[in-house]
A protein has these predicted regions:
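Acceptor-binding helix/loop patch of EC 2.4 sugar-transfer enzymes
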Residues: 53-63, 113-152, 192-201, 212, ...
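Nucleotide-activated donor-binding/catalytic signature segment of Leloir-type glycosyltransferases, i.e.
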Residues: 254-258, 263-297
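Conserved acidic donor-binding segment of nucleotide-sugar-dependent glycosyltransferases
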Residues: 343-344, 348-355, 364-369
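Carbohydrate-associated surface elements
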Residues: 169, 188
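Short hydrophobic beta-strand element within catalytic cores of glycosyltransferases
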Residues: 328-331, 341
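A short, well-ordered alpha-helix in the C-terminal region of glycosyltransferases
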Residues: 357, 364, 371-386, 392-398
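Conserved donor-binding/catalytic core segment of Leloir-type glycosyltransferases
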Residues: 205-229, 235-240, 250-251
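Acidic donor-binding loop of glycosyltransferase active sites
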Residues: 161, 298-314, 327
């Protein structure tokens, strides 16, 4: 089989799928991408694409994302045409992330080739991540911008032969006419790598961090420290917890940036705002930045309690991975988390908007080792049953072969 995978970042959600197909000499796997990030995969040919220009300066802000998607779509089309000549590759099936436009025109160059679209999110001005906070009211400008932002998603929904998304919650965001027939297949996590290590001690030599003597470690992971992922609420919760417990440490993995939602006031960052507020023992709060996979593993294997908070938005890999590590989890009582976590069975749920409740749930777990062990064991069992990448790749493989019939 000639399999073409498309994502602007390599390998992203398609790591395990690419590895699976690349193992067989009967398959040829090509990954069309904008950014390799220095990564390579055995037996996977990487082909780059680059838009010819940036979106038009001064273009209406509503349509700037659509123009960027068109530019990406044109760039991938040119790369696909070039592949046929330069590396003699013509796909039997195409699978790609539809969010940035790279898949837009694949059916125009390969009308007979099945196109499978990975659909991550459909935007709404209310009843979702936007206007979720009680005092938030989207402006008319926000509403019009978000409606227009869905334009290239709608083109992809119409163009793809097969559609899938990772969670039921994400599926529920799409228009009803496209939900019908949309498959739910999570990419899964590596349960062999994300495994418990009872008694693990946390030492990050590259970060100069030695918590091998720490009795309690609270962990938090996010690509960016920002409101969408409950960073301000987490910081307020740990102020409460650290004020009561003098031997507890907190480790935060992620970058001082905003990936989603509103930017902080000009010249500031959300992390900087919390540091200015203070009110916590900075000697026991450790911002370790972005970590390599082995150090990330060390953090979660040594975690006493892991906290994951999110608005009603895309569910992060890190939450599923923390459960696979057997962490005792406190998650936000929001739809994407509730799809996975049953309060008191495989984790705790807390009110996102109430830091006092988050702190209470953290302390309930810190005070009860037997409860932590029970919830952590159940959390890993949940992942083994529903999010094991080996099973999810098989499910996705069946989807691919089904599309080719």
């Amino acid at each position: 089989m000639n399999l073409l995978i498309m994502h602007p970042n390599f390998p992203a959600q398609f790591l395990y799928l690419a590895q699976y197909f690349a193992r067989s000499p009967r398959n040829r796997v090509v990954f069309l991408t904008k950014e390799t990030n220095g990564n390579r995969l055995k037996n996977v040919t990487i082909v780059g694409y680059k838009p010819k220009r940036e979106p038009t300066q001064g273009v209406h802000p509503y349509v700037r994302p659509m123009e960027q998607a068109v530019l990406d779509g044109q760039a991938t089309l040119r790369a696909a045409v070039s592949m046929q000549e330069k590396i003699k590759f013509r796909p039997d099936v195409i699978i790609g992330h539809t969010g940035w436009g790279s898949t837009l025109y694949m059916k125009d160059i390969y009308p007979e080739v099945p196109l499978i679209g990975y659909f991550e999110w459909y935007y709404h001005a209310k009843d979702s991540d936007m206007a979720w906070w009680p005092d938030e009211k989207p402006s008319i400008d926000d509403m019009l911008r978000l409606r227009t932002l869905n334009a290239h998603h709608l083109v992809n929904l119409q163009a793809c032969d097969v559609r899938y998304t990772p969670t039921q919650w994400q599926k529920s965001q799409f228009p009803p006419m496209y939900q019908e027939g949309m498959h739910v297949i999570h990419e899964g996590v590596d349960v062999d790598f994300c495994r418990p290590n009872p008694g693990a001690k946390l030492v990050l030599k590259d970060k100069g961090l030695d918590l091998s003597d720490a009795e309690e470690i609270i962990t938090y992971v996010s690509r960016g420290f920002e409101p969408y992922r409950g960073f301000p609420q987490f910081m307020e919760a740990i102020r409460i917890v650290l004020g009561r417990r003098k031997k507890t440490h907190v480790v935060l993995v992620g970058m001082d940036r905003t990936c989603y939602g509103a930017q902080p006031p000009k010249g500031k960052t959300w992390k900087g705002i919390e540091e200015e507020r203070g009110g916590y023992d900075k000697e026991r709060v450790h911002f370790v930045g972005h970590l390599n996979r082995l150090d990330y593993q060390k953090v979660l294997q040594a975690s006493t309690v892991h906290v994951y908070l999110t608005r009603p938005f895309v569910l992060s890999w890190s939450m599923i991975e923390s459960m696979s590590f057997g962490c005792a989890l406190v998650g936000s009582k929001t739809p994407p988390v509730e799809e996975v976590v049953v309060d008191g069975e495989n984790g705790f749920l807390a009110n996102f908007r109430q830091p006092e409740h988050i702190a209470q749930r953290i302390e309930e777990l810190l005070d009860d080792p037997a409860l932590r062990a029970r919830l952590g064991k159940a959390a890993r069992e949940t992942v083994l049953a529903r999010y094991n990448t080996n099973d999810r790749v098989k499910e996705l493989t069946n989807l691919i072969y089904g599309a080719m019939r």
